[in-house]
Structures are given as C-alpha cells and as structure tokens.
Amino acid sequence: MPRNDQFNNSHPLDDYIEQQQLNNLDNNSNVSLANQNTVLDDFQQQFSDKEMQKIESISQQIKPLDNDGLLSYGSHLQENMSKFSHKMLDEVQTKDIGPVGDSLNQLMTKLKAVNPDELNPEKQSKLKRFFKRTKASINEVFSRMQSVSSQIDRITIQLDRHKNNLSKDIKLLDGLYQQNKDYFDDVNLYIAAAKRRKHEIQTNDIPKLQEHANQTGNQMDIQAVADMEQFVDRLDKRIYDLQLSRQIAIQTAPQIRMIQNVNQALAEKIQSSILTSIPLWKNQMAIALTLMRQRNAVSAQRAVTDTTNDLLTQNAAMLKQNAIETATENERGIVDIETLKTTQSDIIETIEQTLQIQQNGRQKRKEAEKELVGLEDELKQHLLSMKKE
C-alpha cells in the first residue's frame, strides 16, 4: 500500500509495515541464530530505546506453554479496535450529508430564480417587451426577489447549522484518527514483543529442551519439545492476527481522512456560499434594481420634457389661431351687407306676398257677395211661387 502523508503521521515502523504487512514467519523451530539476530537488529533500528523497553516489558507477558495467556495476549487492543470500528460505523450511519447537498442545490436554484437581465428591457425578447410593460416587469421581479431573498435567508440558517455540525464531525474524526493511531502504535509494540518472545523461545528455550531430550531420550522430554514448538506455532498465529488488526488500522486511517476531507470541502463550500455567493447575489440584485430605477427616472424625466414641449407647441398653435380669428372678427361690421340685402329682399317679398293675399281676398269676397245675392233672389222666387200656389 503506498504511503499517503496526508493520512498517516510519520512513525518508526512505517517502512517496516509497508515492506512486511503480513510477514509469514518461518515455522521451522530450527531457524538459524543469524537470521533471528537480524530480526532483533531490525527492531532496534525501527524502535527507539523507550519503545524497546516497552517491548521488553510486554514480551514478558508471554509465558511459554501458557495457552490461555497467549489467547488473551493483545486481546484488549482488539476489543478496543472493535469498539472503535463500531463507533466509526455509528458515525457514518448517523451523519447523513445528503441534506447538506440538498440545501446547497436549493440555494443554487433560488439564486437562479431571479435574473437581473429581466430588469433590462434591452436584454428581453421583443415578444416579452410587447406583452409586458416595463413597470409591471420591475414590480414582478422585485416581488419575486423579496420572496427569494427570504427563502435564501432560511436556507442560510440551515447551511450554517450544517456547517457547525460538519465542524463538530471533523473534530470528532480527529479524535477517532488519534485513537486509531494510538491503537496502531500499541499493536506494533505487541507484535514486536511477540516476535521478540518468539525469538527468545526459538533461540533459547527450544534448543535447551532439545538438548535435554537428546541427553535423556525420555519421551516426555521429547513431547516437551513438541509442545514448545506447537506453542511457537500458536504464537505465530497470534502474531498474524495482530498483524491483520494492524492492517485494519492502516486502512482505517486514510478512510477517516477521506471522510474528513469531504466534510471539510462541504464546510468550505457552505462558508463560501454564506460569505460570498449570497452577499454577491444580493449586491447584484440591489445594483440591478438601482440601475433600473435610474433608467425609469430618466424615462420619466424624458416624458415630462416631451409633454412640456408638446404643451408649449399646442398652446402656441392655439394662441396663433385665436389671434387670427379675433383680428378677423374685429374687422367685420356689426351687420354684414349680405345680411342686410337678404333681410331687405325677404321684407319686400313678404310685403308683395301680403298685398297679393289681400287682393285675392277682396276678389273672393266680391265673388261671394254676388253668389249670396243670387242665392237670395233664388230663394225669394221660390217663396213667391209657393204663395201663388
């Protein structure tokens, strides 16, 4: 496994671990003394004097042929590792970063909900400018901006809460990383102590037992040699188990750092959003609204100027017309000649018609008188004729 300085602190055993993570030790009880001395020399090169003293003390916990003691050797470290792994699992399960991403996505959606270009008629489509008055557009965008700003403020509170939780998680992971490192250091010492004790048994105890068995030829002495060799084999397996636990610690370190890096990146993203993106958005919206109000003020001023000019032009035209009409009327007499001619003609015609009517009336009365006289004579004659009869 390649080293990653970001996740692993420097340790005297790092190079040794990388080269011999799962060291398959020779189970042969007749390993040469030269090879065993090489192992001890490697230990002395990898560990400090203080650590070598600890290794010496720990190695004394291993009693030859004490199988129960060997079974419990380093077990408390593995139990702590089990508790540590359980704690890591709880941390991963209970800390869901999904809501953080959801809040950031909501923030980006809200920031895009209001576009400052909507306040600029020149950047709007012709169809939109045709169907939508600028005033209405400004009011609509301003109202939408206020609503979005309130929603952004609420999202900001959520993001700030997420950032605080992420910061707490980062500190907690720092503690977990230190626990993992302490476990890594301790299990290294126990592995080294077990190897040292194995070396002592192989170089001292077994040769003595073999020599004694060779001298006596006693079957029980020979069995004692076999028991000691089996104990070394169990010790080898115990070392292997501890090496596996150490490998878990090695793999856990970068995993913790990766989780921390993700949390740190999210916290920085939230910080950037709260301190940069949101204020920048508000500033840009404020600038856009201010520029639009200035544009409207200029348009209003232009409209007032145009209206004033139109009024002046219209008033001048009306004044000109009134002056001409007044002067024309002033030059006219009280009664026009044409009016007098028409009136006189009408009067003469009326008199002539009146005289004609009077003449016709006299003529008709004379004719009526004649008819009345005739009727009267006719009536007298009729009466006389009736008397004669």
From Swiss-Prot:
InterPro entries: Toxic_anion-R_TelA (IPR008863). Signal peptide: none annotated. Disulfide bonds: none annotated. Pfam families: TelA. It comes from the Bacteria. PANTHER family: TELA-LIKE PROTEIN SAOUHSC_01408. Belongs to the TelA family. This is TelA-like protein SH1505.
